[in-house]
């Protein structure tokens, strides 16, 4: 077989475009591709900014979330007000949710329950912060063996206030779309490609801003039914068959 007849497709997801120490190798790989598929407009823009000599043809944005099924979540007795389904990394912003919960409790007398599903290097530090903010009765760390579905079905809002660090960015935010498919409104920050993972089914706040998180949480619950309905509609855009067609049309 002549390998030159095989179409070469490159998927760009975010963090790899920060590795400027590997600039020549990455640029060479990108320029060999017949098509580059980005997981967000942010990732595409960042790639062109970091790699000035990138060829300007055959670039496509396809959001990577695939939703197999959207069904109404009829659980009206949810255990958690907030949840975050994500790897336990600093850039995911769990610590900012703790700060917001502390403000809500101390200044607004609002007590929320928060589920964190995931594993990662921040676990020990996050547990220390729970003690610092006296949130032991409000925050549960869920073992990663528990399914995303179980957490989403038992939570009201998905919150992921990501922050940008020199070595890491959020290219998109698949868990926000997955949460929306269970009717959860989403609160995210304006960091990286995260804002592209929600529509009118949530609120975008400035990154690293607990006070804006507080306002967003209050606003979401004031209009909860409306945001929840919009979440189902938004998630429908990521239904598996639609996404497969996007990829097939691209290649």
Predicted regions and their residues:
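Donor nucleotide-sugar binding/catalytic pocket of nucleotide-sugar-dependent glycosyltransferases
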Residues: 31-71
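Conserved donor-binding/catalytic core segment of Leloir-type glycosyltransferases
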Residues: 37, 74-92, 98-101
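Nucleotide-activated donor-binding/catalytic signature segment of Leloir-type glycosyltransferases, i.e.
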Residues: 124-145, 157
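Short hydrophobic beta-strand element within catalytic cores of glycosyltransferases
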Residues: 176, 181, 185-188
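Conserved acidic donor-binding segment of nucleotide-sugar-dependent glycosyltransferases
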Residues: 190, 200-210, 219-224
């Amino acid at each position: 077989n002549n390998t030159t007849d095989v179409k070469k497709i490159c998927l760009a997801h975010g963090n790899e475009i920060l590795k400027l120490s590997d600039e020549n190798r990455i640029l060479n790989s990108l320029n060999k591709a017949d098509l580059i598929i980005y997981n967000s407009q942010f990732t595409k823009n960042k790639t062109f900014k970091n790699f000035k000599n990138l060829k300007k043809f055959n670039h496509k944005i396809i959001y990577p979330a695939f939703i197999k099924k959207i069904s109404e979540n009829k659980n009206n007795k949810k255990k958690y007000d907030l949840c975050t389904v994500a790897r336990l990394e600093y850039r995911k912003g769990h610590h900012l949710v703790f700060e917001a919960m502390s403000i809500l409790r101390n200044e607004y007398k609002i007590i929320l329950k928060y589920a964190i599903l995931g594993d990662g290097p921040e676990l020990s530090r996050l547990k220390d912060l729970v003690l610092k903010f006296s949130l032991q009765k409000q925050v549960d760390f869920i073992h990663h063996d528990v399914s995303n579905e179980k957490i989403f079905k038992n939570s009201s809002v998905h919150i992921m206030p990501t922050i940008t660090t020199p070595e890491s960015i959020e290219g998109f935010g698949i868990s926000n779309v997955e949460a929306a498919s269970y009717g959860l409104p989403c609160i995210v920050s304006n960091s990286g490609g995260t804002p592209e993972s929600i529509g009118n089914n949530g609120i975008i706040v400035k990154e690293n801003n607990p006070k804006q998180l507080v306002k967003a949480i209050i606003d979401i619950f004031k209009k909860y039914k409306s945001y929840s309905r919009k979440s189902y509609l938004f998630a429908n855009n990521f239904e598996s068959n639609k996404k497969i067609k996007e990829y097939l049309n691209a290649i």
